[in-house]
Amino acid sequence: MKRLFLLSVLCLLVLGISAQTAKEEIFADVHRSAANYYAYPAVTAVQTVPPVGYKPFYLSHYARHGSRFLIDPDDYEQPLEVMREADRNGVLTGLGKKTLCVLDSMSRMAKGRYGELTPLGARQHRGIAERMYKNFPEIFKGQVEIDARSTVVIRCILSMMAECNQLQALNPKLRFKNDASYHDMYYMNFSGDPHIKEMRKSPEVKAAKEAIRKEHIHPERLMKTLFANTDYLKWKVDAGELMTSLFDVASNMQSHDTGLELYSLFTKEECYDLWQLSNRGWYISFGPSPLTKGEMPSVEANLLENILNTADTCVVRKDSYATLRFGHESCLLPLACLLELDDCGYQTDDLDKLDAIWRNYKIFPMAGNIQFVFYRKKGSDDILVKVLLNERETKLPVKSDVAPYYHWKDVELYYRNKLEALRK
């Protein structure tokens, strides 16, 4: 008994040590502060062995496109022009001049490629495909059919092709059906709910976001390192806007194979502060925040219904099958919240405590993905499923005696009931 007690205490201590706060995680790797620009992290998770006799036979996923260029030309040009004008007026420090050079290089690199997939983004999806093939070989064996669909955006189409080409290289016998059509956009990238749009622009949301900006944007130290003239800085530069613009460029530079960087402009504390701005913003506008009545994830009801309906047609097939979908983080994050994967559905009015539980970089990095993997056993009609978030097993809001595997009938019933409640 004493030995068991000591072992329990030791386990608790290990768990306490291993459970890092968001601040500690960002201080350990500032790239996490990039939020939705965070490059897909290395996968080290081990897959739990399924119950005896169960084999995977169907995989259904929704993946975000891989790493990309920033979308809007102004993302590069606005901070660049601020620094150019300051240079023309002779008020940049040495670090300011160096920053100008880096911004100019990034602007030229991005010209004509705004929003496009980078080579790293393609590699991310090839890696995901290779691990799917390795982890679930039974699904991709022989002349299996794979239905792969993308939104109509080029970076998503190229992400789809990268993943499919890698699977084809691993098994040339695989048969693919690829599509990217406006016909499927009602569930692949739905954005037509006026109620959701109105809630995101409500006075309460605007006030909350403005308060968050005031709390977490502190540009004074950074500006002093870039500008030698405080009067010029005061009258000619929107310091807060420049700081966040520089941080966006710095954050997304991990999407490229380049030795250039701007993260060194920021202290780790500033990186954490600016990430909180992003984390809270995404939580309010796309997550289950009480400020938006927890309704934001419902925007992905069509996508969840498609996942359920498609699964119903595939689990009765005798052969294996895969359904691959490629879209955006603005769909992936609310889908994870709608599914209540792990703590994605966490709700709190206290935003100061939000990042103790809810951290956006764990949900939707570049190439982020949700995989439903279905298992069956010969002689049994009890289908099992597990759900992976970025290739890591998750906890579902359903009871199970074989977790992280769940009985499909229980999972489907839970989500069907949830969809029905949303549409009343």
What are these regions (language model features)?
Residues 20-122, 126-147, 151-323, 327-424:
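Signature for phosphate-centric chemistry
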Residues 1-23:
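Bacterial Sec-dependent N-terminal signal peptides
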